[in-house]
């Protein structure tokens, strides 16, 4: 708060954007270290709030996704380290919420269709620290609802944003760029199922959302010159969700129940999509 006041209200010469940002980041790191040393959860929460508010309060109004999300990634990794050390599991859920809010904020303020590659990295890259924490938790037997929810929500957000991307600029005419986000998020959900087969319901959720996106694109945006893309996407969808149950049984033979009937619907849905054009 003092650093912010020195820059915004008092306009001290030293407190330019970069020095103020670095100082506030240092305060956040120090707060995490003190929280661990003093076993003080309040300090950790305050440090986290300061960390996520730093890029908001010091925004220059210019788009800098590398700086923003590089910083947020480091902040998330720091919070995950604190959670792993002290088992303050709710912090990882709060970190996920802060990350998603900043993702949506960036998308709402700065995203244009020409930045789709950046959006791919933002919405497919930012879930990785939480999925990594989920994998570590499964391996070390400290998995809990906070870690699980923090890993599940970001890929679902990516799929949710994909519905908006479908109607943004000319992205519907660039299915390769658009459906990279869609299938990438679907793969992240399937990765969680591989790590924890009891989350198999995510396969149907992800597949259902991908089918909905493919259907909307087919009915509202598909043109004759995109037919080859359409058939390629349908086949990719069918193969992914047809092969996955077999892959899961191979990787987790002792933990996977017989293949549920609903998983056989995806090939049929793909055939339905082929009939739509």
Residue ranges of predicted features:
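Extended, compositionally biased regions that are outside compact catalytic cores
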Residues: 1-277
